[in-house]
Amino acid sequence: LDVSGNLEAGIPMCPPEGDAGTGMTATNSVKVRTGNVSAGTSVFAMVVLEKELKKVHPEIDLVTTPAGDLVGMVHCNNCTSDLNAWVNLFKEFMESMGMEVDMNRLFGVLYNKALEGDKDCGGLLAYNYFSGEHITGFEEGRPLFVRRPDDKFNLANFMRTHLYTSLGALKTGLDILFREEQVKLDVLLGHGGLFKTKGVGQKIMAAAAGVPVEVMETAGEGGAWGAALLASYRVWKEDGETL
């Protein structure tokens, strides 16, 4: 790894990892009845449990917080990939019109437009499966958008539909935790790309999960911020100081 020979033995290394333990740290959701959700190209929610689950659920992974408390995790392969593909289609249209595209502004305009849509998304229906989805039993991905001739097909409902479907598989797993297992959750902290546009992903997630969702200013950085915090704890913690 080190052809120069300058690295010394014993240097702390941060292993490449997703937003699991780092996400819990980034959002400070390591206490019982708190949770965090990382939403981007894939999505997962982690809920710190008060007690063990009644039975085994294939949809729920059991892990722990960095401090060792039991966590119920719902992980889904698909979240915003299909949504991002549609946003890129709008980007391509704008470029074809000779316009310069600011992607942050484009996402902001389209995401906020979704808040103007009908509660039932005007009858529009989408499935965001870019890849297989174990929670719902799909081995391969087939993104799909369908509508009836008399549905209310407009931009607001179109974007609202794709934002909601990005969390459809996640809701399937969360319903097992909240309804079957009666898990209690006071707050869910959001991080990842879905939450970069202020307020929109937060509202969609709250509706899907049925619990209050909060977003920190570092939401877009997610696991990277958590990794930095854990590294700081590793280097500068005092004797006996817990996470």
How would you name each of these model-derived features?
Residues 2-189, 194-243:
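Active-site core segments that coordinate phosphate-bearing ligands/cofactors
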